[in-house]
Amino acid sequence: MRREAEAAAFIRDRTLLLLGLVAVLFVTLWRLPALRSSVVVYCAHDAVFAEEILRDFEMRSGVKVLVRYDTEATKSLGLVELLLAEKDAPRCDVFWNNEMLGTADLAERGVLAPHRGPGWERIPEQWKDADARWTGFAARLRVHIINTRNPATDLDDLSRGAIAKPLYGTTLTHYTALWHLWGPERLKTWHHESRARGLREVNGNGMVKDIVARGARDHGFTDTDDFFDAKDRGALVAMKPVRIDGASICIPNTVALIRGAPHEATARQLIDYLLSAEAEMALAKSKSRQIPLGPVDENQLPAEVRELREWSAKCVPLAGFVKDRVECLAWLKSEYTE
């Protein structure tokens, strides 16, 4: 009887162990697709707007999105430099930039791989790389934000104006456009004279918006999404488009596939989604009121976005300014490190 009991216990223990191993194996195999089905995104766009779009992609696709955001103070430039540093051993799959020229520079340096999906096809030629290494979508405009309690009568008088430090983000794009269209010497003179006359530099477009909204400055240079944030909070502000020789500065988001991306298949899925009419319409209807670049149902666009589309009809051709950006940034770095 004792031997029979011991044998039964041995069989029971072995059975439980086997069942446990089977359960562990089942859970592991069940999780493997989820572990494989992920995508790593470096995102310079504001998290408050990007998060909703990325979570919607997760729900639709079942792909887990792992995001690394940048800070307001080093917007876009920090991630561009990180991607350059990781070029030989990439950790990122998709770069969602909040401007065009930094992405185009990465393409020239061999960091990006081509992707000709349905999203690339629907975006007009002026907003995408001919070799499909990057594509623009959902644009913003550079604008003057004006405090209407004490409205500036002369926006060229910058003694009560504000601007973000031009080393990064859309302010760097703004400076690059001036570098190309005015020439380096005129821009350098304007930069030095504006600072001498009292133009206040701060650490980001959001801070420009804040100090104008509370009346610490009468007007400033910012982007349309920051203007709408101030307006929606009840600030007494108005805006006018920044124009250079009659052309506005329209700055799209851009998306690109990283060369050697660890999760290439899901990266291509995400890029196609970001470049879809659905994603552009979602960003147009969001609080940022971004301008769709591809075809969408015009009747669904908010009135404010339709007005922005009119302002952007004639805009500076930024795509050809990559060399200017490199030169302008080199000068700016020398200015701010002396």
What are these regions (language model features)?
Residues 298-338:
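Extracellular/periplasmic bilobal clamshell ligand-binding domains
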Residues 101-105, 213, 218-238:
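A ligand-binding cleft/hinge motif common to bilobed small-molecule-binding domains
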Residues 258-315:
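Mature extracytoplasmic/periplasmic domains
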